[in-house]
Every structure is written in C-alpha cells, then in structure tokens.
Amino acid sequence: MTTKTDYTNEEWLEIMKTPIYAGFYVIFADPSFTGMLKEMKAMGEAIQKADPPGHVKDLVADIAADYEQMTEEKESFAQDQIPKSADQETAKRYILDKVREGVAIIAEKAESMEVLAFKQWLVAVATAVAEAAKEGGFLGIGGQFVSQREESALEEISNTLGL
C-alpha cells in the first residue's frame, strides 16, 4: 500500500485534488446555491471521515489529514484550476481528465487492488455529495436527494474510472 511519502510533492497535490474534482463534478451536474453549500460541506466530510476499502486506508488517511489542515483554500482548491472561460461541458471534461490523472499517478506506484479501492472511494465521495441536498421541489417540499443529472454524473465518474 502506498502513502504520501511514495509520491513527489507535485504528484501528491494532484492526488489531493482528485476527490475534490470528483465532488465538483457532481456539484456542476445540477448546480443550485443552497444545494452547493450542503454538497461542498458533504464533500469535505466524506474526505475527512472516510471509511475506504482496506487497500487504500493509509493513502486516504494521508489525504484526509492534509485536507483537514487546509484553511480557506478548501473551497477554491480545485475550483480555481477549472478554466474560468469554459462552458459547462468543457469544464466537465476538464474535471474528468483531472480525475483520470490523479488515478493514473496512483496506478504508477500502487498495486491494482489499491487503485481499485481508490476508485471506489472516489465514487463514494461523489455519492456523498450527490446525496447531500434535495434537488427540485419548492421551499423544501418535494424534490429528491439525488437528481437525474447527479445520477448521470455518478455514472459518468464510474465509467471514467472503469467501474
């Protein structure tokens, strides 16, 4: 199993961004102001309080520890990297590419079971984001916790990761 010390600082930064990108992908799929706040909070909690598969526990613990030490930059950490002039489809492609890159860095140094477990954890983070806020409805009445767009986003993430 790999840990933070197995990666260069540049590699580690990209690995750290990967679960954030996965969460942002879901947020961008069906954006709403109040939902976004709940979803960003859920993303942070999913990263920090993760219960990942055994093959990736140490790696995720290192990510969670570093994420917890971050301050204001948490919200802008990955979002600042997304091209400002990009339309939604371009931004979504960019985010999925960044998720692939983070997984590829791990795949270079980790065993296949650890890579699979990391991918599963990324989907779990994205799912926690999708389930964080009701979408649709009016004044909190009606709606559903995972919208069709969010379900599609989760499926796209899973497909991108080969799950």
Residues covered by each model-derived region:
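Small-residue-enriched hydrophobic alpha-helices in membranes
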Residues: M1-L163
